[in-house]
Design a protein with these regions (language model features):
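NAD(P)+-binding Rossmann beta1-loop-alpha1 motif at the extreme N-terminus of oxidoreductases
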Residues: 13, 35, 279
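C-terminal accessory extensions/subdomains outside the catalytic/core fold
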Residues: 272-279
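N-terminal amphipathic/basic leader segments beginning at the initiator methionine
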Residues: 1-19
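Mg2+-dependent prenyl diphosphate-binding active-site environment of isoprenoid biosynthetic enzymes
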Residues: 22-272
Length: 281
């Protein structure tokens, strides 16, 4: 999934206000630190891949949606790492925002990124509505984080909200940016989110912290269920393979259907720790 330059340019443009002399300097630094340098930018690249697979792309709408979703993702990472949730000391191979700038600025930076996400799609109300749907309650990323505050949780509902929601926003907004009906693309996004969550659960148990760019063993440390604790290690790897096979079948008819399926499977498999590639092939 190529196209990093347009995404980075759009993200920089979304944070242009932080360059103003009126913006508190430490806050401005925290905002940029939260977004740059980024991770793999998987979500915005997925949105763009879906749009390009569909064909008749509105480039401006596509980039706006991709930017908005990545800003929301970055905001969710900043908040997820806070001591009141995971208390993760580092992210993307560097100290977490709250470690580098303090909890107060981390909260404010995450909040500001959410606001900027919706500002990015202001000219595209249909995309804004999709992003809003999957960011809020009861099924969005906020609900996913809120499940961690409950005495008990349903693993499927928890993972669909925390991970699947934003991937559904990606596939639906990507289709919309190509002037297609977004509804048939919702299920695909949820399934991709499921695959990524299973892969992340496997990495959390078996991955190397340095390779992942974030601490491992977080679910066990916080008493949260995951696919490995539920199905066992081998069972989780097998489950991932079954999800990947269903993903390819779930892609709606579009001109670039075959290539899109290959891209999704390749990117998801790449998340499995290197030493497990043979077992997950």
């Amino acid at each position: 999934m190529d196209g990093e330059n347009p995404i980075e340019k759009a993200l920089a443009g979304a944070l242009i206000g932080a360059n103003s002399p009126d913006c508190p300097p430490k806050f401005a630094q925290a905002l940029h630190y939260s977004v740059f340098p980024g991770g793999a930018r998987i979500r915005p690249k997925l949105l763009m891949a879906v749009a390009n697979a569909c064909g008749d792309v509105d480039p401006s709408a596509m980039i706006a949606g991709a930017c908005a979703i990545e800003l929301l993702h970055c905001a969710s990472l900043v908040h997820d790492d806070l001591p009141c949730f995971d208390g993760a000391a580092y992210r993307r191979g560097k100290p977490s925002v709250h470690v580098a700038f303090g909890e107060r600025l981390a909260v404010l930076a995450g909040d500001a990124l959410i606001v900027e996400a919706f500002a990015a799609t202001a000219a595209y109300p249909q995309i804004t509505r999709i992003v809003a749907k999957w960011a809020s309650a009861p099924h969005g990323i906020c609900a996913g984080q809120a499940w961690e505050c409950e005495d008990s949780l349903n693993l499927v509902n928890y993972q669909r909200a925390k991970t699947g929601a934003l991937f559904a926003a990606c596939t639906m907004a990507g289709a919309l940016a190509a002037r297609c009906d977004p509804k048939p693309w919702q299920n695909l996004g949820m399934m991709i989110g499921e695959a990524f969550q299973v892969a992340d659960d496997i990495r959390d148990v078996a991955g190397i912290s340095g390779e992942m760019g974030k601490p491992t063993g977080q679910d066990a440390a916080h008493g949260l269920p995951n696919m490995v604790s539920t199905f066992g290690y081998d069972g989780a790897v097998q489950y991932l393979e079954s999800v990947l096979s269903r993903i390819v079948e779930a892609i709606p008819e579009c001109p670039g259907r075959q290539e899109l399926g290959q891209q999704i499977v390749a990117v998801t498999r790449a998340m499995v720790p290197k030493q497990l590639h043979r077992g997950a092939a």
